[in-house]
Amino acid sequence: MTTIQERSPMPQEREPNPAMTAADRPIGYGRVQRKEDPRFVRGKGRYLDDVVLPGMLHGAILRSPLAHARVVSIDTTEALAHPKVRAVITGKDLEGLNLAWAPTLSADVQAVLATDKVRFQGQEVAFVVADDHYSARDALELIDVEYDVLPAVVDARRALDPDMPVIRDDKEGKTDNHIFDWEAGDRDATDAVFAAADVVVTQDVLYPRVHPAPMETCGQIADMDKVTGKLTLYCTTQAPHAHRTVYALVAGLPEHLIRVVSPDIGGGFGNKVGLYPGYVLTVVGSIVTGKPVKWMEDRSENLMSTSFARDYHMHGEIAATSDGRIPPRWRRAAPSPTWTPSPASSRSGRTRRRHTPTAPCTPWSPACPSTRSGSSARTSAAASATRWACTRATC
């Protein structure tokens, strides 16, 4: 009988890298020893939900069940009467504090809480601060919101039709759902290649939506010290320095008074780069109550209102000669309904994108003040004559 050991080749002993122990070796050259593993395999990791501060309160977010609707009224009387509720914050409250809108990492703004209307299902409407997590969640059911339902845009391919409702009507002069164009390269040279091509091959591609779904959801603890004016944040962020800059803009504090602590992160995959309204709301909650406030989203919130990716309907064209050669010019157009913030990944040629919104999406964006979305369409052609028209399908 042949054993596994007899069948398996013995591992070859590799010669050690002479630069591994050299004092003057370049950074990153040679083997890098991992130091974080022992505490994780022993269950000693310290994640955000393991952080408990003295006197800490807990927050929960009321989200819109509708994709597109006017907010007629918000009655928080019953929620405030709950014995364990310390505060209920609405968009109107934030307007009084000049905190209704927050800048994004894409140099636009997003609504921290909806004020005039909701623009996607799951948009933040109110924030409850209570003594414990369960009381905060229970109090959400005591908030009475009256909505005036509006038509929603659910098909990105129809978002630019003249009969579609305008989602971004907060922007002055906006009469359609065309959010922005992004273009690079030589338009005339690209068009000339296609005009002279012997063959133009077209294809439509549907790329379904994907979500990073990290094991740990997003959350934050904000601790505003009113005596020193210092703000300490414990956050599930992959970009603590960028977050500090945004918080400085939101709260009007100098950056040196803001400390962002990123503890052990239970997965991110890009999902924890953006700055979500829940983060800002913990800061507001701490300012209002004078105590640390923790917010930790549940799984359904994470899937509903944080960054996702893909979800494209793309139309592509490749120009070629009759003998199969592809000239070194290409083009891509990417209309997206979810306001994707990231630039195209092209290295040469002409890249063109148009962005259009669909109401039920959960975007993370440069273009919608109440939205956040995932990543952009990507084309890896280095030197080819292609052009892509891409529309995110549905959300």
Question: What is the predicted role of each segment?
Answer:
Residues K291-M296:
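Surface-exposed extracellular loop regions of Gram-negative outer-membrane beta-barrel proteins
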Residues Q12-I27, V85, L160, D181-F194, ...:
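Charged, low-complexity, helix/coiled-coil-prone segments
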Residues G30, E36-R39, P103-T104, T175-Q220, ...:
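Glycine-rich loop/linker segments at domain edges
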Residues I89-Q123, R157-E172, Q238, A242, ...:
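Short, surface-exposed loop/turn segments at secondary-structure boundaries that line and modulate
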Residues T2-H178, V200-Q203, G278, S286-V288, ...:
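Flexible, low-hydrophobicity surface segments
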Residues I61-G91, F127-Y147, Q220-P263, G270-T289, ...:
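Alpha-helical support elements that line or immediately flank enzyme active sites
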Residues Q33, V51-G55, Q110-V112, K117-G122, ...:
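Solvent-exposed alpha-helices and their adjacent loops that cap or buttress functional pockets
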Residues E15-A19, D108, S135-A159, F180-G185, ...:
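Gly/Pro-rich active-site capping loops and adjacent beta-alpha segments
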